[in-house]
Every structure is written in C-alpha cells, then in structure tokens.
C-alpha cells in the first residue's frame, strides 16, 4: 500500500512512501538478468591502442608526462601494432614526435610523404593490413611554436 500524500513536499517523503515497503530490484538480482538489461558494454572492439612514433631504430623513449608509455621507433611501432591485432584490438592511433630541426612556423614537414608518421602508417599497414590506423593531421608536432595551427602576427589561423 502506498502512503503517498500530495500535501508533503517531494524532499520530505521517504522511499517507502513512494514505492511502498518493497523496493523492486528484481532486474539486478541475478547475473543473467543484469546482463540482459545492461545499457553499456565495453569490449575489446571498443579499444584503440595509441602509439607514439619517433625516428630511429630499436628505441623506446619514455614519456615523462605519461608513466609507462613510450615513444617508439618505426620497427617497434610495427611490433606494437602486431601485438594489438593479436589481442583483437581493431585499431591503433598514431602520434608523431617530430625532431625540432624538422619543424618550422607553418608545419610544412607534415606534407612530406617521408615524414615519420607517413612512414609509420605505411609500415604498419604493410605488416598488419587488418588493423585500422587512425592518424591525426594536427600541426602541433610539426610547428616550431607547438601550436595546432599556423601562427601569423601572434594569432593562430
């Protein structure tokens, strides 16, 4: 029996007045029913493996701001992509770390077909054709000022 009285303000009513003395939790009682009504499911199909790429050979360079994460040379990036595919991860996202000597005000090195990210994309796709590769065409790794855009008269355009 519900003892709800409209005269009471909402904040003054307790749970029993709203639902009765019984709280219906039957959908959460057993594992099978919780799984049936679950709204979100996270699986390996939802994962994207980030790979940070640098020039060179056989080098793992720690990223101080992300403990346990490394910048990898192309050869090691390919191995990580192979590892991701073996684990069933459908895609990787690659992020370049471009040497300062290759950066300029306009990020022109991004257009070089032989830049580190373009070479990494080709090498990974050749070695692991079934994996998706997500690349970012951001300018910040390629500009000397580090902004994700072209800087003109102190304004990013």
Regions found by a protein language model. Give the residues of each.
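N-terminal amphipathic alpha-helix/helix-capping segment at the start of soluble metabolic enzymes
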Residues: 2-60, 64
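N-terminal small/glycine-rich loop or linker at the start of catalytic domains
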Residues: 42-69, 134-157
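Short, well-ordered coil/turn segments that N-cap beta-strands
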Residues: 44-47, 88-91, 128-131
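Generic structural hydrophobic/aromatic packing signal, biased to beta-strands
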Residues: 49-51, 92-94, 124
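Glycine-rich, proline-tolerant flexible connector loops at the mouths of alpha/beta enzymes
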Residues: 60-74, 87-115, 142-143
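Non-catalytic positions within long, well-ordered alpha-helices that form the structural scaffold/packing
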Residues: 82-85
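Alpha-helix-loop-beta-strand connector modules within alpha/beta enzyme cores
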Residues: 103-137
């Amino acid at each position: 029996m519900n003892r709800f009285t409209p005269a009471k303000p909402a904040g003054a009513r307790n749970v029993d007045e709203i639902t009765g003395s019984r709280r219906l939790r039957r959908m959460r009682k057993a594992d099978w029913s919780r799984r049936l009504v679950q709204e979100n499911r996270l699986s390996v199909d939802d994962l994207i493996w980030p790979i940070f790429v640098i020039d060179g050979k056989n080098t793992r360079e720690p990223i101080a701001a992300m403990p346990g994460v490394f910048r990898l040379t192309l050869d090691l990036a390919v191995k990580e992509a192979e590892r991701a595919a073996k684990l069933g991860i459908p895609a990787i996202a690659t992020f370049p770390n471009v040497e300062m000597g290759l950066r300029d005000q306009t990020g022109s090195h991004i257009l070089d077909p032989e830049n580190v990210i373009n070479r990494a994309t080709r090498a990974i796709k050749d070695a692991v054709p079934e994996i998706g590769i997500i690349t970012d065409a951001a300018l910040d790794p390629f500009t000397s000022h580090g902004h994700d855009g072209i800087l003109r008269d102190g304004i990013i355009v």
